[in-house]
Curated annotation (Swiss-Prot):
This enzyme's EC code(s): 2.3.1.47
Keyword Transferase among UniProt keywords: yes
Subunit structure and binding partners: Homodimer.
Gene3D superfamilies (alphabetical): Aspartate Aminotransferase, domain 1, Type I PLP-dependent aspartate aminotransferase-like (Major domain)
Pfam families membership: Aminotran_1_2
Stated role: Catalyzes the decarboxylative condensation of pimeloyl-[acyl-carrier protein] and L-alanine to produce 8-amino-7-oxononanoate (AON), [acyl-carrier protein], and carbon dioxide.
Pathway note: Cofactor biosynthesis; biotin biosynthesis
Top-level taxon of origin: Bacteria
GO BP, sorted A to Z: biotin biosynthetic process
Positions that bind substrate: R21, H133, T352
Taxonomic classification: Bacteria, Pseudomonadati, Pseudomonadota, Gammaproteobacteria, Enterobacterales
Name the record gives this protein: 8-amino-7-oxononanoate synthase
Enzyme class, broadest EC rank: transferase
Amino acid sequence: MSWQEKINAALDARRAADALRRRYPVAQGAGRWLVADDRQYLNFSSNDYLGLSHHPQIIRAWKQGAEQFGVGSGGSGHVSGYSVAHQALEEELAEWLGYSRALLFISGFAANQAVIAAMMAKEDRIVADRLSHASLLEAASLSPSQLRRFVHNDVTHLARLLASPCPGQQLVVTEGVFSMDGDSAPLAEIQQVTQQHNGWLMVDDAHGTGVIGEQGRGTCWLQKVKPELLVVTFGKGFGVSGAAVLCSSTVADYLLQFARHLIYSTSMPPAQAQALRASLAVIRSDEGDARREKLAALITRFRAGVQDLPFTLADSCSAIQPLIVGDNSRALQLAEKLRQQGCWVTAIRPPTVPSGTARLRLTLTAAHEMQDIDRLLEVLHGNG
């Protein structure tokens, strides 16, 4: 089989399964509205959960940062790319979340890959929730350590896997809020079992940070759990992009020496760090509380109105509200029907989710209004 035949076969298989991904160029894709092909849609696919991507205070901070620092960092943080803006953001994040140190990364994917690649050796074991993000599972699969997966949120199965002999260290990996189901991990129980077996806990709280808990401190804070490794990202609740790893001082020093994604990547622009500092200030303020309260009310309104639909509504109290459709083609058809009625919704299919669980991944944000939720419900009920 030639290279071209190999590529064609893979693409043909995706097409046959109604699983071929595609991108849509949009003129505006975050916030309440999505604009594509000169048409405006109510946007129920954005991860901008607090509606901060267009916040004037954050935009102003980015502009001022660009004027002060330029539009790029100029290099890796180990060379010339570690700005005083980066340092200030790291210190503010660490203080906010109760850790000694924070290290910035260009994306959540890079942060997860870097930590696992740097921490794990051949004699070690990763025990991951089987619904963990692709960045976590891919890094675990590529690492020299053993990978075992436990049934989603099943602490008993986790304990059984941890109890089996392991010559090295054990790292338990899970998410705070799961990206495709919107449910939360039982972190207190997971941490207890992990500690009983002398393991460390790594939590990716991409979809909880900024959105859940006191001052938006996230799922771990809400459940009174402090994992050894906490990954937070800035493309969701913060409305920007990037990520950080929260950890002890010694672990931070270790990652600075051995995390290749950190060492060999150009740092995020200092202007972006300034925007993130402004976003954090909003998240921690009374305005942040008001945005979280509004989002919670929108979620309650949606869940109350969707109960009698012929789909499975995932058990989620988060901004992620998946409607499990099952069949790939049916999910695509339903997403297209919603778009025709002015609601932009994305169909999520395997391999992103397990086979037979294709879904509409609906996301609600604080930028929405109650009438937007009512319109979505009207269309879902076939009255659009």
